[in-house]
């Protein structure tokens, strides 16, 4: 049975490309760029994001370097923070010329103040926002209904992206649907553990507590392409100059449509864009001429008890 959606012109369109057979969806990324090396980092770049002017509110957690949580809430809900008094900690911003400062009162408001001071420092002048993506990957969707499967930790965002695509796409002969994730990684803030431990009076639940050792900031984008060409042909265009394939009347992307959501600031609210020109501008200037440093996209945790790195396995 063929599924249908109604576009903004109230025309009934096939939700599934006509030339595909709808079996059980198996989601698989095709990676074009992946510079990640640290397997101990948790990616949190899409867990809390929302969409501007949609019923999909961003829920950015109250996190900062030095914050302490139970293991089972770390990188998930980030709730039940342990707010017992801590020793002062040294923060390091990994600019080319590192900026080092002491956070006397280890809490969120003090942390934000330290970021403001760092951004005004002479050390920050040595920092240039990266222009090369940290990660770019694509996946064939087969159906718009599969978008939600791409965001297992944020179904609301996936559902919103699906509905936006259903509303905006207006193509009669769709041969392929695909989604892409783009990550630009900015600077990292890390901490040194005080020699006499993090807590002034160690809590009784040391075994279950972990603290945020590093936070990495960056910007992200998610986009969906509906094309009258095959997925492999679309993927191939992004290995070269995709804008040539958009401007060329016979190009792979010339008749394609795109929904682009970009997330670039601490509020974690995605902006909606609808053209390949918008995507090109984002890829060329992801940090908006240095006017944004992004939002937390990676974090790393260590155990309070033994100061060893925390992973899901331990």
Question: What are these model-derived regions, one by one?
Answer:
Residues 4-314:
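Membrane-permeabilization and membrane-interfacing ectodomains
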């Amino acid at each position: 049975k063929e599924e249908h959606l109604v576009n903004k012109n109230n025309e009934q369109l096939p939700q599934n490309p006509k030339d595909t057979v709808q079996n059980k969806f198996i989601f698989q990324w095709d990676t074009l760029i992946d510079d990640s090396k640290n397997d101990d980092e948790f990616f949190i770049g899409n867990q809390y994001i929302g969409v501007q002017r949609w019923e999909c509110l961003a829920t950015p957690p109250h996190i900062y370097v030095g914050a302490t949580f139970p293991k089972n809430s770390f990188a998930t809900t980030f709730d039940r923070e342990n707010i017992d008094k801590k020793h002062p900690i040294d923060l390091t911003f990994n600019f080319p010329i590192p900026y080092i400062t002491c956070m006397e009162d280890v809490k969120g408001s003090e942390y934000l103040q330290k970021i403001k001071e760092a951004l005004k420092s002479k050390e920050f002048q040595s920092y240039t926002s990266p222009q090369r993506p940290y990660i770019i990957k694509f996946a064939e969707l087969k159906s718009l209904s599969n978008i939600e499967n791409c965001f297992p930790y944020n179904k609301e965002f996936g559902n919103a992206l699906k509905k936006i695509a259903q509303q905006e796409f207006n193509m009669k002969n769709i041969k392929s649907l695909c989604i892409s994730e783009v990550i630009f990684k900015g600077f990292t803030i890390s901490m040194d553990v005080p020699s006499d431990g993090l807590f002034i009076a160690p809590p009784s639940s040391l075994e279950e507590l972990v603290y945020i050792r590093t936070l990495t900031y960056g910007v992200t984008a998610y986009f969906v392409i509906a094309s009258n060409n095959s997925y492999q042909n679309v993927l191939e265009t992004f290995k070269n100059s995709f804008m040539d394939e958009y401007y060329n009347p016979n190009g792979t992307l010339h008749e394609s449509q795109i929904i682009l959501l970009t997330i670039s600031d601490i509020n974690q609210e995605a902006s909606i864009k609808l053209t390949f020109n918008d995507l090109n501008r984002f890829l060329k200037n992801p940090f908006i001429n240095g006017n944004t440093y992004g939002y937390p996209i990676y974090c790393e945790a260590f155990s309070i008890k033994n100061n060893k790195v925390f992973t899901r396995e331990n």
